[in-house]
Amino acid sequence: MLNYEIYREIFEVWNYRLWNTFSGLLLWMSHPAWPSTVWQTYSSDYETNGVFYGSRKACEPLHIQFQPDTYNIYFINNTLNDYPGIRTELKIWDLDAREIFSKSTVNDSKANTSVKCFVPEIP
């Protein structure tokens, strides 16, 4: 789970700053020299682990993500097509399964851009 979250965040930060301050990404120690449980893209016997799935999720061509440093919801378009009228919806429930927040917006997304959708009002 740790590998999944770490690498998903690495790629989501890259998406969030798409073409602004980031234009590439370097993964250090992607090949493990000996068996390990963290910071590797695959195991010493070439089996995929959480890194593969976290990276794949973050690198979806069309991806919605929460940016924890700014508390914004972003729509990422990593395709060569424009997508007008993309609807982004967020719902938050408490532990008693009561909906405590709901918001929906419609945004236009140009090719290869990240669009700030809204800031959720987290209670």
What positions do the PLM features span?
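Substrate-binding clefts and catalytic carboxylate motifs of secreted carbohydrate-active enzymes
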Residues: 1-84
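Intrinsically disordered, low-complexity Pro/Gly/Ser/Thr-rich segments with frequent PxxP/GP/PP motifs
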Residues: 85-123
